[in-house]
């Protein structure tokens, strides 16, 4: 393909983490070749990077069968919008970021339209629904994975695959000390700080924030001097938290800025499962991982999931770095008990922090955005 010719790339990131990774990729590609333009599904970070978002990822970020059914109309409309573009005005490349239920269907449309498909960040099919690898082999031209053990999985299935490294290895770099970070948020460095991380999806917040807040109340009863911080994800608004925070008497600082500095300011964190657990681990802050699904979704998942851990920091480390409390175990009492131990048991805390160092060791070096940009340029040039 001639150098300098405008090159259009459709990119689909249906969740907050994908918005972060997509933004880094867009910047890296445009730095290498300004002739590239991006459009598709994303959030504020991708828009800031220069991507035209036809659909906001905040409207797509749901988990579980019941939750998807509730948002079916929005998701279906987004799919039809992108399908129409793929068939009537096909781009030079389609980049899919995780979000497999939606993205694999879109990949099928791209194949019909003759558009090459680059899949960035593998669905966790090694954990469940391994049969999906056959569909991926049919629909995806190249798989770019971020965890080393994913490479042999795809190689054995005959899927072209590259290990590009985990983008978080570059994104999570904090130079501040705990006290410096705490001071920057106006917090009292002499008092312990607990992070309350309810997730980036509205459905997660409504399902888990009440439990997290009740755990915080129990902690405050035992440790009256505690301070709490709560990050507001880019996919959420103040209104999404209002039903639970209005009238809440806990000393909670809500912020949208400098998430990694906020993690460093914390002495311990209550976090939902997801990419955020990896970020917290890379910062080096002890945490407890919680998750709840609707009863129907959980029963289905229990039959299908084939891995020991749900927390990404534990999956990457290959061991139980952070305790996981799932469904009924994710009670305010158990959550408060684990955080209380992290705050009061110095020996337990030290051993925990030592395990956290294993996570960064397993991720290896950075450079994921640069490697991904190289793949994008190569695939477009060959198309």
Swiss-Prot record:
Enzyme Commission number: 2.4.1.182
Catalysed transformations (reactions): a lipid X + a UDP-2-N,3-O-bis[(3R)-3-hydroxyacyl]-alpha-D-glucosamine = a lipid A disaccharide + UDP + H(+)
Which terms are listed as keywords in the entry? Glycosyltransferase, Lipid A biosynthesis, Lipid biosynthesis, Lipid metabolism, Transferase
- Name the family: Belongs to the LpxB family.
Q: Could you name the domain of life of the organism this protein comes from? A: Bacteria
UniProt keyword annotation of Protease present:
no
The answer on whether this UniProt entry bears the keyword Lipid biosynthesis reads yes
Record protein name field: Lipid-A-disaccharide synthase
State the coiled-coil residue ranges.
Answer: none
Pathway(s) served: Bacterial outer membrane biogenesis; LPS lipid A biosynthesis
The cross-references to NCBIfam families, in alphabetical order and at most eight, read: lpxB
Q: List, in alphabetical order, the Gene Ontology terms for molecular function in this entry.
A: lipid-A-disaccharide synthase activity; phospholipid binding
What role does it play? Answer: Condensation of UDP-2,3-diacylglucosamine and 2,3-diacylglucosamine-1-phosphate to form lipid A disaccharide, a precursor of lipid A, a phosphorylated glycolipid that anchors the lipopolysaccharide to the outer membrane of the cell.
* Recorded GO CC terms: membrane
Q: Which GO terms describe its biological process?
A: lipid A biosynthetic process
Sorted alphabetically, which HAMAP family does this protein's record hold?
LpxB
Q: Which InterPro entries match?
A: Glyco_trans_19 (IPR003835)
């Amino acid at each position: 393909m001639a150098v300098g010719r405008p090159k259009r790339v459709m990119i689909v990131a249906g969740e907050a983490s994908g918005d972060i990774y997509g933004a880094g990729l867009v910047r890296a590609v445009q730095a290498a070749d300004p002739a590239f333009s991006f459009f598709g599904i994303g959030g504020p970070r991708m828009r800031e990077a220069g991507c035209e978002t036809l659909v906001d990822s905040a409207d797509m970020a749901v988990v579980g069968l019941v939750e998807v059914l509730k948002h079916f109309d929005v998701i279906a409309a987004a799919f039809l919008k992108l399908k129409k573009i793929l068939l009537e005005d096909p781009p030079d490349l389609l980049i899919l970021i995780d979000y497999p239920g939606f993205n694999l269907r879109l990949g099928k449309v791209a194949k019909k339209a003759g558009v090459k498909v680059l899949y960035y960040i593998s669905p966790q099919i090694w954990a469940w629904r391994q049969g999906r690898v056959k569909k991926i082999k049919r629909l995806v031209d190249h798989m770019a994975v971020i965890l080393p053990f994913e490479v042999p999985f795809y190689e054995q299935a005959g899927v072209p695959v590259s290990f590009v490294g985990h983008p978080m290895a570059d994104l999570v770099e904090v130079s501040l000390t705990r006290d410096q970070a705490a001071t920057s948020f106006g917090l009292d460095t002499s008092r312990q700080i607990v992070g309350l991380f309810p997730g980036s999806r509205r459905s997660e917040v409504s399902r888990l924030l009440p439990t997290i807040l009740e755990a915080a109340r129990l902690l405050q009863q035992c440790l009256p001097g505690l301070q709490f911080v709560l990050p507001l994800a880019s996919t959420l608004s103040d209104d999404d938290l209002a039903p639970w925070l209005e009238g809440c008497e806990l000393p909670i600082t809500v912020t949208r800025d400098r998430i990694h500095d906020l993690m460093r300011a914390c002495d311990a964190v209550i976090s939902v499962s997801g990419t955020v657990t990896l970020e917290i681990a890379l910062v080096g802050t002890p945490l407890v991982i919680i998750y709840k699904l609707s009863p129907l979704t959980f029963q289905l998942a229990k039959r299908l999931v084939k891995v020991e851990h749900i927390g990404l920091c534990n999956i990457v480390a290959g061991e139980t770095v952070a305790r996981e409390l799932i469904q009924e175990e994710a009670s305010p009492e158990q959550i408060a008990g684990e955080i209380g131990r992290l705050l009061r048991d110095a020996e337990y805390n030290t051993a925990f922090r030592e395990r956290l160092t294993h996570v960064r060791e397993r991720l290896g070096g950075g450079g994921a955005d640069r490697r991904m940009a190289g793949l994008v340029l190569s695939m477009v040039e060959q198309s």
